[in-house]
Amino acid sequence: DASRAERFAQRPQSRLWRAEMAEQLATFDYHAVMHDDATLLQWLLAVRDIGLTQLQGVPTTEDVLPVLATRISFIRESNFGVLFDVQSKADADSNAYTAFNLPLHTDLPTRELQPGLQFLHCLVNNATGGESVFVDGFAIAEALRQETPDLFRILCETPVEFRNRSRTSDYH
């Protein structure tokens, strides 16, 4: 049996990333992930260590995403449902259903159990704009810790209450 120190030394190491990661984004073939356990493992390790990957060759049908997600775990439902379409609606009750340009954000921080993994699956995009921008929050926190340790400490020690109110729900 490995000692506690040996197990600690062998633990997964997250990799912080910045803008240059876009050129080296870990990319996997959808069909290989679905049918080859070794590729599935490599994909899951990349998700664990980097936090963001891309699957190519994913069919553009609605039934594909739940099959992919349940290949690795169960799907946790939210007030948006099991799956939801991000689209512009006239009577939107969430920014997800508007054409607004959203700033960088974290989805569902009001939840006791935030999403462990999220998938974005583009079926059709006839609109201009709508690009997704991703940032590594841990890299931002590390830069803050290095550059302004006092502000980093305040961020770590100050409780923040998140709130989400809509016509049908109130989470905080």
Question: Where on the chain are the PLM-derived regions?
Answer:
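Hydrophobic, ordered structural segments
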Residues: 1-13
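Active-site environment of non-heme Fe oxygenases that use a 2-His-1-carboxylate facial triad
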Residues: 18-172
